[in-house]
Curated annotation (Swiss-Prot):
Belongs to the glycosyl hydrolase 13 family. Ca(2+) 1 binds at residues 661, 663, 992. It is found in: Secreted, Cell wall; Cell surface. Residues 42-132, 1140-1248 are annotated as: Disordered. A motif (LPXTG sorting signal) lies at residues 1246-1250. It comes from Streptococcus pneumoniae serotype 4 (strain ATCC BAA-334 / TIGR4). The active site is at 778 (nucleophile), 807 (proton donor). The modification Pentaglycyl murein peptidoglycan amidated threonine is found at residue 1249. Ca(2+) 2 binds at residues 828, 831-832, 882, 886. This is Pullulanase A. Residues 1250-1280 form a propeptide. InterPro entries: Carb-bd-like_fold, CBM41_pullulanase, Cu-Rt/internalin_Ig-like, Glyco_hydro_13_cat_dom, Glyco_hydro_13_N, Glyco_hydro_b, Glycoside_hydrolase_SF, Ig-like_fold. The lineage of its organism: Bacteria, Bacillati, Bacillota, Bacilli, Lactobacillales. Pfam families: Alpha-amylase, CBM_48, Gram_pos_anchor, PUD, SpuA_C, YSIRK_signal.
Length: 1280
């Protein structure tokens, strides 16, 4: 059945409609069309219609990364430039619009539109009526809401508000109730009282998206009661001005503005140029006195000015003799001047710049105070206006001060040896009581002895050590092994050296316990009259944890630790792994998997002998990963995490849900030594999880693979987890000594000695106890580089084959005003130990934060060819990598949409349609090929190999639903016509979703009859991994080696390759002399690659990858490519890998093209079953001596095996030169998960890409039609 007109048909219709002159015109038009058909194309098949026109319509809202980033990744923390708003002791004058300026005769060529706002008489600006702000309320103005439907958006508030928002996301203050003025919407928030200083907020929607990132505003003065968000959601204490304008406000206490003016210069459109001193008058009246609006140049940064009183003469005309200079036009659109004050203020409250903002006791001879700014500060002035007293009120002599202008801090020197009591520091009117800094505790209490609970003597004795230097008393509360809620007894610990507390539990403690194994405990800490129950940070196992009980009482707020001896549990033959095909980090192929996801598919329930979702069940499916060929399995966090009920881990989550699920990725850590009970067959048994995890690692090692643990040291689930142990120490700190937070937990301060020690001790324990083979650091850029490097060295001392990688986003916050080198992407040029993920290759190949879902290289978006090439050779453009092993090459991970889903979103094609489903898989295979043939270390997300999706296939969500019903963390996907997909919701961050969303779909991964495309993609990746491991060509070990051995073929500007394009080709010479070439055509039409003379030797190559399969052996009848006179032509959405062996012959046997419908049956294979050792098959290679020799014949006759398979699956392997032709004959999954029969088009009906020789008849026909048409026209003319 015909669906769309062909290119030829379109031309005929155009001819008919254009000529409109009777039958003769029609005939002439037809002859023109036939003439066009006879004209050959040159470098690409232009006659093939493009099926996916560019469409820039954005139909989705991107989630905030947790990366981004992030991205990556986490929430944005935005610092206010000038918090708050206007309401000082100034007269409250309603703003009215300035009167039109009296226009003098314009000067020739002068742009009057860029003149400052002024007038000849005082006027007021006018705004739409705005309700007065009630006492104890704070008004937040929003220029523009992030989304159109204001009723589905709200203001989520916390900190010094009367009632912090609860019940995410619906507990926010709804914009449904917002008022509107000339600026935009506004909401009033009630504060918790006069002491309120900080208001924090964000705008979210009912789907649970944080649309703006976290924002906060500090009240500069008590009467400050409003703030504004601009269009980018930056917070200001004044109403932001339109872009390209700065408003200069001038307030005079005497109210006399007569002849007061401004003379200005710098980055302004029209600097003052009249006769001196005729400046621009202050005539417009606003909230803060008089003002002048000055148009700015593009990208303006600074401008200078003078305040003038034109009633005076000579130099006295200057109100201040010195020039004013403002250098922050990038961040401020209003400035505030007062009388003859020398300061330029960026807030309407005239708060002096140099203000103390906090004080910390940092050492026995030093106190450090933070300041709003120290620009221009003089040592003698700081000394003169500073004062320090001890807790008795006695003045302490300041012997010296050191000013750190960049860090905005002053260090006072003196005798501050009293470490038990705070000091009071004042500067002018600002006064702060010191907080004990972590630096003072490091100097006084840092400890390197043993910590935690050591079970000894067959369980008869426990040695306890806790570090808590500020505690007044510490006891251990022991709970019954069979009932963790039952207290057996309490034993006091004794104060030890350097802030430690110690005790030995045995038969003398009168607890009545002869064997402490399996009993539980918590620490009870008393400090300054307050008592807390805390979890031992060095606990080796825990009681079954249920976060739902955390609000019952303090005993349930954190988990209870267990007394265990891990050395005696699990397989005693566990040792470090001997990983196949792995010597250096460039050899690794990392596969990321979630323990529960991997076996939660009900389809394999009957095959499992162990409970699904557990370490034990994971073992039963390990052979799949061995068969795939990966070297390392990276497990999402397996250490104890907070928000989960482990007691219900056995319950299946079969219904579709993306919130309120008993499921977690594990990025909310509770402990860094104990495993979670979620993946244990018995969470109530604290020993079993240890034994079972050891067994999993052992089985991974037996199969020649390694295990990498995903660890989350950058933040905790709750700040109190460590603040209760020792306040103001374990976390990075603000300048005033309060802990910094992230995602609701604390940012662990790894520059602090005991925190760094916790991280390194944890890493060493996990390596030594579980024999793991690597670590992936979540948000590694949050850490200092020194700590990560030290952890790496400690781990490698135990396991020399261990590898480390992490998210190197530039997110380091650290301690305020204490910068240090971060463990981020910028660190890569200084280290060859730890690798980072490359967001550059991810974003360029398939899109990512902040433009996820936009077309990229494999989804139809042209990209800079040189940028793509640099990424493929492990030289990303956004950071410097001095070694290929520094770079983790990836296009999918657990965050955001899966690769399959992001492709569907980007190309706007509904996968429920067979041809779309096939096209998505073709693009997916392109991406996988590019990652697995790239230099560096490839990384695969579980299911990426078969096209995993997280589509929300609940029948109630088959079509779009009301906004308040939209699934949490979902994108609604539409096609390019704006029509929603069938089941249009796709979950992008599924950390709170059910098994129905998250499961690894084993049927898709392995059943080739039911899901031929999925299994083809899976087998394609398996072949790519085998190909990668068969040669050093894709695993070069140095940057110099890459420069010498890898060369770009598709040079932009040559042979039809554009600067930005969707094709790439390059050559690699392996260390053994073999030559490999990779060509990728991500275009929607066939493309030809000109080899020229420099790469003519590639005509002798064997094909290792085509559009259907890949591997280390040559393909007998490769599909999707053909040799041409100029070089190589690839079909649309096709890639290939070629090899020219050193001796000019094939390495191994040539593989026959196999039918797509052959089901994949992964088995536990030994080396003998590796494809490289298959029996030789007849080699069929193109004759490269003939210019028109084809690798894939244009007629594309199927092999016998293919022909045999077409009884079940018609029209297999049709060669295509356009996207539609490439995918029209595939069998794919429809919305009911049933197999859709292939489109019954015959291969013979596909258009020919070559030029036939029957053109003589065609030209004869053209001539006849033209003569007939001319006859009709002459007859018509004669009749008229």
């Amino acid at each position: 059945m015909r669906k769309t007109p062909s290119h030829t048909e379109k031309k005929m219709v155009y001819s008919i409609r254009s000529l409109k002159n009777g039958t003769g015109s029609v005939l002439i038009g037809a002859s023109l069309v036939l003439l066009a058909m006879a004209t050959p194309t040159i470098s690409s098949d232009e006659s093939t219609p493009t099926t996916n026109e560019p469409n820039n319509r954005n139909t989705t809202t991107l989630a905030q990364p947790l990366t981004d980033t992030a991205a990556g990744s986490g929430k944005n923390e935005s610092d206010i430039s000038s918090p708050g708003n206007a309401n000082a002791s100034l007269e409250k004058t309603e703003e009215k619009p300035a009167a039109s300026p009296a226009d003098p005769a314009p000067q020739t060529g002068q742009d009057r539109s860029s003149e400052p706002t002024t007038s000849t008489s005082p006027v007021t600006t006018e705004t739409k009526a705005e309700e007065p702000i009630e006492d104890n309320y704070f008004r937040i103005h929003v220029k523009k809401l992030p989304e159109e439907n204001k009723d589905a958006q709200g203001l989520w508030t916390w900190d010094d508000v009367e009632k912090p928002s609860e019940n995410w996301p619906n507990g926010a203050l709804s914009f449904k109730d917002a008022k509107k003025d000339d600026y935009g919407y506004y909401l009033d928030v009630k504060l918790k009282g006069e002491q309120a200083k900080k208001i924090s907020f964000l705008i979210n929607n009912t789907a649970g998206k944080n649309l703006t990132g976290d924002k906060s505003v500090e009240k500069l003065v008590p009467k400050m009661n409003e703030a504004w968000l601009d269009q980018d959601y930056k917070v200001f204490s004044y109403e932001p001005q339109p872009a390209g304008t700065v408003r200069v406000n001038y307030y005079r206490t005497d109210g006399n503005y007569d002849k007061k003016s401004l003379w200005y210069w710098g980055d302004v459109k029209n600097p003052s140029s009249a006769q001196w001193p005729d400046g621009t008058d202050f005539t417009a009246t606003g909230k803060y006195g008089r003002y002048i609006d000055i148009p700015l140049n593009e990208a303006a940064r600074e401008f200078g000015f003078l305040l003038l009183d034109e009633s005076k003469q000579g130099d006295d005309v200057k109100i201040r003799k010195e020039n004013y200079k403002f250098t922050d036009l990038k961040n401020h659109s209003q400035i505030f001047l007062k009388d003859d004050d020398e300061s330029i203020y960026t807030n309407p409250y005239y708060v002096h710049d140099i203000r103390m903002t906090g004080a910390q006791h940092v050492g026995t001879s030093s106190i450090e105070s933070s300041f709003s700014t120290l620009v221009g500060a003089k040592k003698e002035d700081i000394l003169k206006h500073s004062n320090i007293t001890n807790h008795l009120g006695n003045k302490v002599t300041i012997t010296d001060v050191a000013i750190d202008e960049a860090g905005k801090k002053v260090t006072y020197s003196g005798d501050f040896s009293d470490t038990k009591h705070p000091y009071t520091v004042s500067y002018n009117s600002d006064q702060f009581t010191t907080k004990t800094s972590w630096r003072l505790k490091d100097e006084t209490y840092s400890y390197d002895g043993k910590l935690g609970a050591d079970l000894k003597e067959e369980g008869k004795q426990v040695d306890l050590t806790l570090w808590s230097p500020s505690a007044d008393k510490v006891s251990v509360v022991v709970y019954d092994k069979n009932d963790p809620d039952k207290v057996v007894g309490t034993v006091a610990l004794e104060k030890g050296e350097r802030g430690t507390w110690k005790q030995t539990l045995d038969s003398t403690n009168k607890l009545g316990i002869t064997d402490f194994t399996g009993y539980y405990y918590q620490y009870q800490i008393e400090r300054q009259g307050k008592t807390v129950l805390a979890l031992d940070p060095y606990a080796k196992s825990l009681a079954a944890w249920n976060s739902d009980d955390s609000k019952i009482d303090d005993a349930h707020k954190v988990a209870k630790a267990a007394f265990v001896d891990p050395a005696k549990l699990g397989p005693q033959d566990l040792t470090y792994g001997k990983i196949h095909n792995f010597k250096t980090r460039e050899d690794a192929v990392i596969y990321e998997a979630h323990v529960r996801d991997f076996t939660s598919d009900p389809a394999i329930a009957k095959d499992l002998t162990k409970p699904f979702g557990t370490f034990e069940a994971f073992i039963e499916k390990l052979d799949y990963l061995k068969d795939l060929g990966v070297t390392h399995i990276q497990l999402l966090p397996v250490l104890s995490y907070y928000f989960v009920n482990e007691l219900k881990n056995h319950e299946r989550l079969s219904d579709y849900a993306s919130s309120n699920s008993n499921y977690n990725w594990g990025y909310d850590p509770q402990n860094y030594f104990s495993l979670t009970g979620m993946y244990s067959s018995d969470p109530k048994n604290p020993e079993k999880r240890i034994a079972e995890f050891k067994n999993l690692i052992n089985e991974i090692h037996k199969r020649g693979m390694g295990a990498i643990l995903d660890v989350v040291y950058n933040h905790t689930a709750k700040v109190d987890l460590f603040e209760d142990l020792e306040p103001n120490y374990y976390h990075f700190m603000d300048a005033d000594g309060t802990p910094r937070t992230s995602f609701g937990g604390g940012r662990l301060g790894t520059t602090h000695h005991m925190t760094k020690r916790l991280l390194i001790d944890s890493i060493k324990y996990l390596v030594d106890t579980y024999k793991v083979d690597g670590f992936r650091f979540d948000m590694m850029g949050d850490h200092d580089a020194a700590s990560i490097e030290e952890a790496y060295k400690a781990a490698r001392a135990l396991n020399p084959n261990l590898i480390m990688l992490g998210e190197g986003w530039r997110t380091y916050a650290g301690d305020e005003n204490m910068p240090t080198k971060a463990a981020d992407q910028d660190w890569m040029k200084h280290t060859d130990t730890v690798a980072v993920f490359s967001d550059d290759i991810r974003n360029n190949l398939k899109s990512g934060y902040p433009n996820e879902g936009q077309p990229a290289f494999i989804t139809g978006g042209k990209r800079d060819v040189n940028t793509i090439f640099k990424n493929l050779i492990a030289q990303p453009t956004n950071f410097e990598a001095d070694s290929p092993g520094d770079v983790i090459q990836y296009i999918a991970a657990h965050d955001n949409l899966t690769l399959f889903d992001i492709i569907a979103q980007s190309i706007k094609k509904d996968p429920s349609k067979a041809e779309n489903y096939a096209e998505i898989h073709r693009r997916l295979r392109l991406g996988n090929l590019m990652v697995l043939t790239a230099q560096g270390t490839p990384f695969i997300h579980s299911g990426q190999e078969y096209g995993r999706t997280k589509q929300f296939r609940d029948p109630a969500y088959k079509t779009p639903v009301a906004e308040d019903k939209v699934p949490n963390k979902s994108h609604l996907l539409r096609d390019k016509d704006g029509n929603p997909f069938d089941y249009p919701y796709f979950i992008h961050d599924s950390y709170d979703s059910s098994d129905a969303v998250n499961k690894f779909d084993w049927t898709k991964a392995t059943d080739g009859k039911a899901y031929p495309e999925n299994v083809k993609s899976r087998d394609y990746m398996k072949g790519l991994i085998a190909l990668r491991q068969s040669t050093d060509a894709f695993r070069l070990k140095s940057l110099q080696d890459i420069k010498d051995r890898v060369h770009l073929i598709t040079v932009p500007g040559q042979n039809g390759v554009e600067k930005e394009d969707v094709v790439i080709g390059y050559q690699i010479t392996a260390p053994n002399g073999d030559i490999y070439a990779v060509f990728v055509n991500a275009d929607e039409k066939a493309r030809e690659f000109n080899l020229g003379t420099a790469f003519a030797h590639l005509r002798n190559a064997e094909v290792l990858a085509d559009e259907n399969q890949a591997g280390p052996v040559g393909i007998a009848n490769p599909k999707g490519l053909e040799w041409t006179e100029k070089g190589l032509k690839l079909n649309a959405l096709t890639a290939t890998v070629l090899r020219v062996s050193q001796n000019g012959t094939s390495h191994e046997s040539t593989a026959e093209e196999k039918p797509d419908s052959t089901p994949s049956k992964p088995e536990h294979q030994n080396e003998a079953s590796h494809p490289a050792h298959q029996d030789p098959a007849p080699e069929a290679r193109p004759d490269s001596t003939k210019p028109d020799a084809k690798v894939a014949d244009a007629e594309n006759k199927p092999s016998q095996a293919t022909a045999d398979s077409q009884a079940e699956q018609p029209a297999q392997e049709a060669q295509a030169s356009s996207v539609k032709e490439a995918v029209r004959n595939e069998s794919v999954e429809n919305s009911s998960k049933e197999n859709i029969p292939a489109t019954p088009d015959k291969q013979a009906e596909l258009p020919n890409t070559g030029i036939k020789n029957e053109n003589k008849l065609l030209f004869a026909g053209i001539s006849l039609l033209a003569l007939l048409g001319l006859g009709f026209l002459l007859k018509n003319k004669k009749e008229n």
